[in-house]
Curated annotation (Swiss-Prot):
Keyword Repeat recorded: yes
GO cellular component: a single term: intermediate filament
Top-level taxonomic group: Eukaryota
Name of the featured protein: Keratin-associated protein 5-2
Subunit annotation: Interacts with hair keratins.
Family: Belongs to the KRTAP type 5 family.
This protein's encoding gene: Krtap5-2
Keyword Ion transport: no
Role: In the hair cortex, hair keratin intermediate filaments are embedded in an interfilamentous matrix, consisting of hair keratin-associated protein (KRTAP), which are essential for the formation of a rigid and resistant hair shaft through their extensive disulfide bond cross-linking with abundant cysteine residues of hair keratins. The matrix proteins include the high-sulfur and high-glycine-tyrosine keratins.
Signal peptide: none
Sequence repeats: 21-24, 27-30, 33-36, 134-137, 144-147, 159-162, 169-172, 179-182
Region feature (8 X 4 AA repeats of C-C-X-P): 27-182
Keywords associated with the record: Keratin, Repeat
C-alpha cells in the first residue's frame, strides 16, 4: 500500500514521509502518519520545527538558551524568553523578564523583580543579594537584611528607617529626619 504519498510502498525505497512527518516511524501503518501541523511530540516542542520523520531542526532558536530547559534532542521546552538564556541555575523557573538571566539564588522564581535577579525570594536572604548593590531599595523590608541594612550606602537613602537605629550602626546618618530619635540623636555634630 502507499504510505503518505510514497509511491514505492512501505519498503526501503519509500524514503520516509517527507518534511511534514512528525513521527519516528512513517511507513507501514494503516493510518497515514503525515500531518500538516508539526507537533514534535517526541522532542519537547522544537523551536525550529520538525525535520523529516520526527527529528528536530533549529534547536533552541537564537536567544541562547531555553526557558524551561531543553529536551533530549536539543529542542526547547517552553520556548525561549528574552532574558538571554539560562545560566548555571539549570533553567529559568517561571520565565525571565528583563533581568539578563539567572542569578545566584537558584533561578528566577516567577520572573525577575526590580532587584536585578532575585524575584520572589524577596531580594534579600540566602541568595546573597543583600551583599551586592541590588537590594538598596528593598533591603529593609521585613527583617531580611538587618545585618547589612545599616551600611552607609543603605542608610543614606530612605530604605532603612525601620531598622537603621539598632545599636550604633548608623550614627553618621541617623539624625537626619526623625528615623532614629530614641537612640541616635546623641550624635549631633
Amino acid at each position: 500500500m502507499s504510505c503518505c504519498g510514497c509511491s514505492g510502498g512501505c519498503g526501503s525505497s519509500c524514503g520516509g514521509c517527507g518534511s511534514n512527518c512528525c513521527k519516528p516511524v512513517c511507513c507501514c501503518k494503516p493510518v497515514c502518519c503525515c500531518v500538516p501541523a508539526c507537533s514534535c511530540s517526541s522532542c519537547g516542542d522544537c523551536k525550529g520545527g520538525c525535520g523529516s520523520c520526527g527529528g528536530c531542526k533549529g534547536g533552541c532558536g537564537s536567544c541562547g538558551g531555553c526557558k524551561g530547559g531543553c529536551g533530549s534532542c536539543g529542542g526547547c521546552k517552553g520556548g525561549c524568553g528574552s532574558c538571554g538564556g539560562c545560566g548555571s541555575c539549570g533553567g529559568c523557573k517561571g520565565g525571565c523578564s528583563s533581568c539578563g538571566g539567572c542569578g545566584s539564588c537558584g533561578g528566577c522564581k516567577g520572573g525577575c523583580g526590580s532587584c536585578g535577579g532575585c524575584g520572589s525570594c524577596g531580594g534579600c536572604g540566602s541568595c546573597g543579594c543583600c551583599q551586592s548593590s541590588c537590594c538598596k531599595p528593598c533591603c529593609c523590608q521585613s527583617s531580611c537584611c538587618k545585618p547589612c541594612c545599616c551600611q552607609s550606602s543603605c542608610c543614606q537613602s530612605s530604605c532603612c528607617k525601620p531598622c537603621c537605629c539598632q545599636s550604633s550602626c548608623c550614627k553618621p546618618c541617623c539624625c537626619q529626619s526623625s528615623c532614629c530619635a530614641p537612640v541616635c540623636c546623641q550624635c549631633k555634630i
